């Protein structure tokens, strides 16, 4: 088993701070603090920040340091609409190649997602991981590596918003149902409806996000408290 490098460890740690909201959009990422927490030197942290900047999660400001990138509604719209087309295109390609065994693998991932469909931080992170595996599986079957890389980049840029939206039962349930319907349509070999459902799934997530400014502005409550808010009139 390959040992995780210091740069990879720092990258994973910083990304999780951003995703879970411990580091807010516009907040400075202090190299000394990260290095101290991980008990490593600053160069690996600096290299990790360079990588995260390239992935669109961090921005560097001259003589000021690194900051969590801030997004506008236009940024969100651009990312989600592009993501919807990439995911639908991947599924369209995959429909020509997918096997019954691979459909069973997708079903298993959906079952695991359902088992983790709870508004607790550790469950949301598990749901996110399974969600990503589901779409990576489809893109791998599609056989287009460039498409896979583009989608992975977009996923990272909006992962923190995905984490926040999945803290609401309504959206968590809807996401799980979308994936179940997509697998059912794949099994039925209904290419047109499967691709449409894939687009609808991504665009539904965008609509939910933009209709909840508390999430978009990173002022949303902790996942464990969101159920109560979701039930308010």
Residue ranges and their predicted role:
Residues 1-96, 214-233:
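Short linear motifs at protein or domain termini
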Residues 22, 57, 121, 190-191:
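Residue-level recognition of short, well-ordered coil/turn positions
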Residues 97-164, 174-185, 192-207:
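Conserved amphipathic alpha-helical segments that form helical-bundle/coiled-coil interaction surfaces
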Residues 167-171:
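Solvent-exposed loop and edge beta-strand segments that line ligand/cofactor-binding
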């Amino acid at each position: 088993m390959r040992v995780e490098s210091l740069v990879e460890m720092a990258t994973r740690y910083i990304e999780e701070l951003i995703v879970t909201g411990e580091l807010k959009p516009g907040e400075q990422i202090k190299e000394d603090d990260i290095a101290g927490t991980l008990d490593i030197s600053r160069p690996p942290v600096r290299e990790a920040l360079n990588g995260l900047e390239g992935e669109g999660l961090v921005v560097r400001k001259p003589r000021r340091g690194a900051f969590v990138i801030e997004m506008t509604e236009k940024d969100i719209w651009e990312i989600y609409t592009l993501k919807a087309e990439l995911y639908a295109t991947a599924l369209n390609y995959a429909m020509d190649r997918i096997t019954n065994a691979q459909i069973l693998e997708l079903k298993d991932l959906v079952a695991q997602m359902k088992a983790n469909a709870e508004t607790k931080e550790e469950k949301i992170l598990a749901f996110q991981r399974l969600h990503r595996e589901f779409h990576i599986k489809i893109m791998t079957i599609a056989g287009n590596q460039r498409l896979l890389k583009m989608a992975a980049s977009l996923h990272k840029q909006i992962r923190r918003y995905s984490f926040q939206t999945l803290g609401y039962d309504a959206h968590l349930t809807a996401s799980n149902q979308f994936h179940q319907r997509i697998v059912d349509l794949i099994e039925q070999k209904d290419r047109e409806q499967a691709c449409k459902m894939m687009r609808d799934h991504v665009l539904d997530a965008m609509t939910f996000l933009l209709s909840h400014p508390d999430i978009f502005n990173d002022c949303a409550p902790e996942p464990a408290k969101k159920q109560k808010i979701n039930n308010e009139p």
